[in-house]
């Protein structure tokens, strides 16, 4: 939907319904050893995952976007870590279905060039993750975020200096979690022959 003739303001809506079937390896009930103390085991009782995805995006000047939406999962397949009943020193991973798992999100992208020699670009995604593992359970939820920021300084003689930040909150999947992660990278680039040849010198994850 366009708000004006030059399409400076636009509204874009999307909806889709999807089905994801479990892989043969996820259904295979035989154990697959992954290390001396752990193994994978399939679950032949897995059900397909049904997903309803919808979003609406406001676009300004073909560059700035604000999106809100949701991904609603029924019988989402997740991996669970468990302890072997016969030997507590051994663990295994098995796939199981979550009865419901809904992700409600807002996403923002904002490129900006305040000066001829400075380019800034930032994006942010915030997510509310609501989970009901079994039909008789109550929902429990988490807030998640993903952030990226990029600053590029154009220097004389076709040099450029680029600083990057990436941040991810603690993530949750099955009965496990992944700790938050923040990285800062710095890259110096030199171009020759109208940009056809590029050399890069950089350091990733400077503060860790």
Language-model features, listed with the residues they occupy:
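Conserved C-terminal beta-signal and adjacent last beta-strands/turns
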Residues: 140-208
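Residues on the lipid-exposed face of transmembrane beta-strands in outer-membrane beta-barrel proteins
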Residues: 1-5, 54-60, 106-112, 149-153, ...
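Repeated loop/turn-to-beta-strand initiation elements of outer-membrane beta-barrel proteins
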Residues: 7-11, 62-68, 116-120, 156-163, ...
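Outer-membrane beta-barrel translocator domains and adjoining extracellular loop/strand segments
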Residues: 24-32, 37-40, 70-71, 76-87, ...
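Gram-negative outer-membrane beta-barrel transporters
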Residues: 72, 90-168
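Transmembrane beta-strands of outer-membrane beta-barrel pores
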Residues: 3, 15-21, 31, 62, ...
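Outer-membrane beta-barrel signature, preferentially recognizing the C-terminal barrel domain
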Residues: 5, 17-74, 91-105, 111-113
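Transmembrane beta-barrel architecture of outer membranes
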Residues: 10, 41, 51-53, 103-105, ...
């Amino acid at each position: 939907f366009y708000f004006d003739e030059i399409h400076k303001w636009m509204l874009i809506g999307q909806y889709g319904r999807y089905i994801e079937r479990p892989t043969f390896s996820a259904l295979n009930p035989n154990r697959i050893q992954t290390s001396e103390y752990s193994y994978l085991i399939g679950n032949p009782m897995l059900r397909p995952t049904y997903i309803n995805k919808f979003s609406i995006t406001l676009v300004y000047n073909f560059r700035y976007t604000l999106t809100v939406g949701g991904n609603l999962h029924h019988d989402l397949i997740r991996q669970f870590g468990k302890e072997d009943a016969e030997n507590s020193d051994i663990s295994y991973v098995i796939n199981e279905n979550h009865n419901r798992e809904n992700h409600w999100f807002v996403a923002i992208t904002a490129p900006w060039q305040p000066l001829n020699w400075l380019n800034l670009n930032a994006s942010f995604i915030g997510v509310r993750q609501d989970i009901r593992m079994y039909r008789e359970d109550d929902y429990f939820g988490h807030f998640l975020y993903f952030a990226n920021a990029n600053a590029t300084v154009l220097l004389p003689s076709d040099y450029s200096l680029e600083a990057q930040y990436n941040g991810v909150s603690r993530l949750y999947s099955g009965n496990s979690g992944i700790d938050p992660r923040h990285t800062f990278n710095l890259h110096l680039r030199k171009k020759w022959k109208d940009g056809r040849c590029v050399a890069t010198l950089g350091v990733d994850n400077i503060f860790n």
